[in-house]
């Protein structure tokens, strides 16, 4: 469930200088007596292994109504893959952007997910052509943005120390989708399907 977070944090005062002696204080930065209010946009931050991020991702992916854009570094979780197939079966276009080396290694070890997607209409996959990492772990369906450190692997979603941030902030969603479209349009991408 999403919530509205408002955080009031005191900024460090003069004591900061002992750790950063050459750091000058910008004029726009509040003094230690001021408070700073964080964004009040709806967001939720979740952590594994305390929470099962796989269930959170699946529940929110299933709510996709218009499209689903995914940039995922590692992707070996079959339950998440099935949720994506279910979304595509409803006629919703799904675009998946992957890191080249990670995708190739996963195909060599276990091509199950790629084979599942290959049999499914409405799923398009592109792999970054460059050897520079595509290290994002994010998705958007136009109404929700998920970002964080958690890859889509069973261990990454359930056992490792990872985070997933979910937000409905329209500006954040637009920013991700703009960046995703730029990545998707690269001329050196490999079109998988």
Kindly give the residue locations of the regions a language model identified.
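Ligand-binding grooves and catalytic loops that recognize ribose/phosphate and carbohydrate rings
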Residues: 19-22, 103-135
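Signature of lipid phosphatidyltransferase scaffolds
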Residues: 20-24, 140, 144-193
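Primarily the HKD phosphodiesterase
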Residues: 57-120
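Structural recognition of the beta-strand scaffold that forms the well-ordered cores
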Residues: 69-72, 95-98, 126-127, 140, ...
